[in-house]
A protein has these predicted regions:
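Short phosphate-binding loop-to-helix
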Residues: 87, 99-122
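Intrinsically disordered, low-complexity terminal tails and inter-domain linkers enriched
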Residues: 61-98
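Long, charged alpha-helical interface segments
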Residues: 165, 170-245
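Short Gly/Thr/Asp-enriched flexible loops that form oxyanion-binding sites at enzyme active sites
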Residues: 135, 139-149
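General beta-strand structural signal in soluble alpha/beta enzymes
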Residues: 6, 29-32, 50, 102-103, ...
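N-terminal beta-strand-loop-alpha-helix module at the start
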Residues: 1-62
Length: 245
């Protein structure tokens, strides 16, 4: 089950529309000012989450007026909700008439994007694409990158995407097909003190049983040269960034 989260960071709307057409998402979630994208595109998300401190009041009100159930609840209640009890009914987005609104207090321990990811996972999603999670606020972007680890530890594939980058976090091997690559460059950044036994095949700069350490730039800007490239390692966590100019 695949989810699309549109967060409140910088969003290239032409790219976002194209991405939605490329994939068939079972669930869409608008995060705070990210609901502006759905509003302008005349689309209805399944969920709207956040403290709503950055969205225009008239946009929020337009969705509230089309909502039967304003399901405001605490983050703790959301966290405890099981997939079995959620009873989320999949339906085509064009038939989705009324979103579920989850509103939270501005003073909280989790960002709105974290709440959105937890919402998707609680509904049984095993793949999550996040748009609008990069931009001018480096602290928010770094926080969103860290959230990839939360999803990874629960066995959920989570991607941050914008027009130029596709970012994921892995704790096991990965195969990248050249025909499906996101851009010309693949960067590998250790997210643990060491990534041991790292072997890269099908890349311009291969490695064999290498120990890659944090705080070095060795893994930046590699390139796929074969029909497919393989990343394997024994232990650690890697951030994989596919980029294009």
């Amino acid at each position: 089950m695949e989810a699309l989260i549109v967060s409140g960071g910088h969003l290239d709307e032409e790219f976002a529309v194209s991405h939605m057409r490329q994939y068939s998402f079972d669930m869409t979630i608008a995060v705070d000012s990210g609901m502006g994208f759905f509003y302008r595109q005349n689309r209805m998300p399944h969920y709207i989450v956040g403290d709503f401190d950055s969205v225009k009041p008239e946009i929020l009100e337009s969705f509230r007026n089309r909502t039967e159930t304003d399901a405001s609840e605490s983050f703790q209640e959301l966290q405890l909700q099981s997939t079995e009890s959620a009873d989320f009914e999949k339906q085509p987005e064009q038939r989705q008439k009324k979103p579920v609104i989850l509103q939270f207090q501005p003073e909280k321990d989790e960002t709105d994007t974290e709440i959105a990811i937890r919402t998707a996972i609680s509904q049984g999603c095993d793949t999550i694409h996040i748009l609008g999670a990069t931009g001018t606020r480096v602290d928010h972007m770094m926080g969103n990158i860290h959230l990839l680890g939360m999803a990874m530890e629960q066995g959920v594939s989570c991607l941050l995407l914008d027009k130029y980058n596709r970012i994921r976090m892995i704790n096991r091997g990965l195969v990248l097909k050249k025909e499906e690559q996101y851009g010309n460059y693949v960067s590998l950044l250790p997210f643990t003190p060491q990534v041991t036994g790292l072997t890269l095949t099908g890349f311009k700069y291969p490695l064999n049983d290498y120990t890659m350490e944090c705080y070095h730039s060795l893994g930046v800007s590699n390139e796929i040269t074969a029909e497919q490239a393989e990343i394997s390692f024994q232990d650690g966590v890697l951030l994989v960034v596919e980029s294009r100019d």
